Amino acid sequence: MAKTASPGATPPGNGTEPLPDNYEMALAELETLVARMEGGALSLEDSLAAYRRGATLVAFCQQQLEKVEQQVRVLDGATLKPLSSGTAATDGEDDDL
C-alpha cells in the first residue's frame, strides 16, 4: 500500500514553485527543507521533491552571492586584497575617530 501524506502536510515541492524574492528567504526555505528531510517523516517522493527544491535554492543562493561579490568588486575596484595578519592586528584601532 502506498504511503500517504499526513493531513495538513504540504509536499516540499513539485518543481513549479517560484524562486524566493531574495537570498534570506531562499536560505530560510532551504533550512526548513533540510530540517524536514532530517526529521525522516517525508515519503520517498516528498524527499526527492525536497532534494530537487533544495538544489534549486542552493543554485539561487550561489547566484545571488556571486552577484553581490561582483557588485563589491565594482565598488572597490582593484583594492580587494587578502587580509594579512598585520592588517588584522590593527583592525581594533580606530585612528579616524
Curated annotation (Swiss-Prot):
Bidirectionally degrades single-stranded DNA into large acid-insoluble oligonucleotides, which are then degraded further into small acid-soluble oligonucleotides. The keyword Transmembrane helix does not apply. PANTHER family: EXODEOXYRIBONUCLEASE 7 SMALL SUBUNIT. It comes from the Bacteria. The keyword Chaperone does not apply. The gene is xseB. It catalyses: Exonucleolytic cleavage in either 5'- to 3'- or 3'- to 5'-direction to yield nucleoside 5'-phosphates. Residues 1-22 are annotated as: Disordered. It is found in: Cytoplasm. GO terms for cellular component: cytosol; exodeoxyribonuclease VII complex. One of its GO terms (biological process) is DNA catabolic process. GO terms for molecular function: exodeoxyribonuclease VII activity. Belongs to the XseB family. NCBIfam families: PRK00977.1-5, xseB. This is Exodeoxyribonuclease 7 small subunit. Its EC number is 3.1.11.6. Heterooligomer composed of large and small subunits. Keywords: Cytoplasm, Exonuclease, Hydrolase, Nuclease.
